Amino acid sequence: MNIEKADYGTIIRFGTMQDLNTKLQMEGKTLDEVIDVTDKEGVSLLEESLIARKFDIAKVLLANNAKVNNISHEGCNEFHFIASNINQDGALDIAKILLDRGTSLMVKDKKYGNSAFFTLCQEIFKVRSVEGLNFLETCFESVQEYDTCNKAGYSIRMLINERGTDKLKQMMESRT
């Protein structure tokens, strides 16, 4: 990769933190100056790091106060982007930071109408790790609505009733 020609998102996606630091030095910029840059699709550098499973970079960006709740042109926020990698080492640590920072679980993507929480549930239910299921239980406290259907006609309630744990079902029923 030609660091000189590559944009910051490309460097994050295909490079290392060292490559990003090299690019910043070459341009005479600081991380604070570019931390919230988005690409033509509205995807932030933090989101690029989540897509690429560069959780070490995500941790640095979050430690330097990268903006959360960035919504891409497709309607996705950070939880949508980390969801497909949520079962990878280090992903839940980042997801917990995102939750603590107030990243919305209810933002819906434009393509499917899936909330960030729905998307996380889909992926965590595939592996069903204790840590992942515990994270969903923690998230559930911030879920305001679970009966609205996505474009395929499925709701969070339906997903939890079909594939969720008994504890998630109990949590949901205790709120109705």
Ranges and model annotations:
Residues 19, 56-57, 90, 94, ...:
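Conserved ankyrin/ankyrin-like repeat signature
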Residues 24-34, 59-67, 96-105, 134-146, ...:
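Ankyrin repeat domain, specifically the short helix-to-loop turn at the C-terminus of the second helix
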